[in-house]
């Protein structure tokens, strides 16, 4: 795996629906509408499914149901599906997908023979025309005297005229940039914006897009600083730690700091909005937390806010191992209770770390500085997912920062069933045909993989890894066949192996089912 791929995975990723979980086909296809005449866009309409890599197989799907499939003699980059005049019989939400052919003669699993679904394209056959999509790029905030941002508007129909409106202001704004089906509007002032489009000068504007809110921020918002690998591991031969700083937009310069002191460490930038630092642990002269910040092109006199701090810990294992004890006893603990893990050393003024055994790594899950000879770590509202082997370690708070070996492991056993997450439906009533049904799964611990499961089915319908305690899950293209009861669950990301219970179900009812 490349370093850039590792960074992108570290900052969060989302897997597609169940029929594409094992696919790595590049990019999803594009579906666009090509009317015979923009004066009467619904009189004779053709849908074009275009893909980056040539293929022989194209499939058109309407309202979540398969509609048409073509198999060609030779691979092409696009295929045209003629709908003709739009009536109640062929109006709806369309998507397409394309067949994937491996570069060598291998047998793919059936579900891996397709690309992801294309963008959704709404065909109504009436006016006003369906709304475009809109979003802020690269961020949804501006600073006084700072760089503007764009509002990007898109509709899957070429040749239209885009208009932007600001709430409370008469008149419209024309695009500053436009390419294929997307238009960009430069935004210098905060406010609520929406865009629409015209197919011809005498036509009616389309339905407006969803509101895009641009806020004013006093300073550039902070970047995120994270440890490569998600968890901190300690072993005596370790000499370097890797930190990644990511800004919310492209930056001219980054700084890695301890307190107010800028560290003289040259970073490597895989992208314009990120820098990776290799920190030599042997060259550090203090244990202060690390932060990072950035500044923008043309605004080099203004630094962003600092990131949240990241603490490091390391050990040469030259000092005696501490002793770890549990209060109450580590066996037969009750769910929902609190357990105290006491780490005791032979000297005072140390930094202590609580470690948990993964597979195969022993990782640091908490750190505490102590002026005495011990530190007390607390695990609150414990459940079966906290069961496992724990140990502790310490290091001196002054150079040369010698440290101990890990204590003898202590096993925690928590009784009871695994905790259940909570699944929340982010819509009301019935789900319209061809639209998305978006859920939020609320768990108990960060760094997990969450799954959307349906009653009676073994394969998840959606998966998402998250560094927080919740994640968005969805049915991306709802048809009548999606009516049913859905739940969520989560499993630990490596190196841990716990699994939650199943949430209470949420019923999905689809219009027309």
Curated annotation (Swiss-Prot):
Glycans are attached at residues 44, 89, 192, 369, 381, 389, 485. Pfam families: Ig_2 (PF13895), Ig_3 (PF13927). Residues 22-126, 127-219, 220-312, 313-415, 416-513 form the Ig-like V-type domain. SUPFAM superfamilies: Immunoglobulin. Disulfide bonds join 49-96, 153-195, 245-292, 343-392, 441-488. Residues 1-20 form the signal peptide. GO terms for biological process: growth hormone receptor signaling pathway; immune response-regulating signaling pathway. Isoform 1 is expressed in normal liver. Isoform 2 is expressed in the regenerating liver after partial hepatectomy and at very low levels in the normal lung, brain and testis. Its main location: secreted. The keyword Cell membrane does not apply. SMART domains: IG. GO terms for cellular component: extracellular region; plasma membrane. The keyword Coiled coil does not apply. InterPro entries: A1B_glyco/leuk_Ig-like_rcpt (IPR016332), Ig-like_dom (IPR007110), Ig-like_dom_sf (IPR036179), Ig-like_fold (IPR013783), Ig-like_Receptors_ImmuneReg (IPR050412), Ig_sub (IPR003599). This is Alpha-1B-glycoprotein. It comes from Rattus norvegicus.
């Amino acid at each position: 795996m490349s370093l850039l791929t590792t960074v992108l995975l570290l900052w969060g990723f989302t897997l597609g629906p169940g029929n594409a979980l094992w696919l790595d086909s590049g990019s999803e296809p594009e579906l666009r509408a090509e009317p015979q005449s923009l004066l009467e866009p619904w009189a004779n309409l053709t849908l074009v499914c275009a893909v980056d890599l040539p293929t022989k197989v194209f499939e058109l799907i309407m309202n979540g149901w398969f509609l048409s499939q073509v198999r060609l003699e030779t691979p092409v980059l696009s295929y045209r599906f003629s709908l003709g005049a739009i009536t109640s019989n062929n109006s709806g939400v369309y998507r397409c997908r394309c067949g994937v052919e491996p570069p060598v003669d291998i047998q793919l699993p059936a579900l891996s023979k397709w690309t992801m679904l294309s963008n959704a394209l709404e065909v109504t056959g009436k006016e006003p025309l369906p709304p475009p999509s809109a979003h802020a790029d690269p961020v949804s905030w501006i600073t006084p005297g700072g760089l503007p941002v764009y509002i990007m508007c898109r509709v899957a129909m070429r040749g239209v005229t885009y208009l932007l409106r600001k709430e409370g202001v008469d008149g419209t704004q024309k695009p500053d940039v436009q390419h294929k089906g997307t238009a960009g509007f430069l935004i210098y002032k905060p406010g609520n914006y929406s865009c629409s489009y015209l197919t011809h000068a005498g036509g009616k504007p389309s339905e407006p897009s969803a509101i895009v809110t641009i806020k004013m921020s006093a300073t550039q918002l902070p970047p995120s600083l994270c440890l490569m690998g998600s968890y901190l591991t300690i072993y005596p031969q370790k000499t370097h730690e890797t930190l990644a700083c990511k800004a919310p937009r492209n930056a001219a310069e980054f700084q890695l700091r301890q307190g107010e002191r800028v560290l003289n460490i040259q970073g490597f930038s895989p992208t314009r909005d990120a820098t990776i630092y290799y920190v030599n642990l042997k060259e550090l002269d203090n244990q202060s937390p690390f932060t990072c910040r950035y500044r923008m092109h043309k605004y080099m006199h203004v630094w962003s806010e600092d990131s949240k701090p990241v603490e490091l810990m390391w050990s040469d294992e030259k000092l005696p191992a501490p002793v770890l004890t549990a209060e109450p006893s580590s066996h037969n603990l009750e769910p929902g209770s609190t357990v105290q893990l006491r780490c005791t050393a032979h000297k005072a003024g140390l930094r202590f770390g609580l470690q948990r055994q993964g597979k195969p790594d022993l990782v640091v899950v908490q750190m505490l500085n102590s002026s005495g000879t011990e530190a007390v770590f607390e695990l609150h509202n414990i459940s079966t997912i906290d069961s496992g082997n724990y140990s502790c370690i310490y290091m001196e708070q002054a150079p040369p920062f010698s440290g101990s070996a890990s204590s003898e492991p202590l096993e925690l056993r928590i009784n009871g069933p695994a905790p259940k997450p909570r699944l929340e439906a982010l819509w009301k009533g019935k789900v319209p045909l061809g639209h998305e049904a978006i859920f939020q799964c609320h768990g108990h611990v960060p760094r997990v993989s969450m799954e959307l499961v349906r009653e009676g089915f073994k394969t998840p319908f959606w998966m998402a890894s998250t560094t927080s305690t919740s994640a968005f899950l969805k049915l991306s293209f709802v048809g009548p066949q999606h009516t049913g009861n859905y739940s969520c669950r989560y499993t630990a990301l490596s190196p841990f192996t716990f699994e939650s219970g199943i949430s209470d179900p949420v019923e999905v009812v689809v219009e027309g089912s």
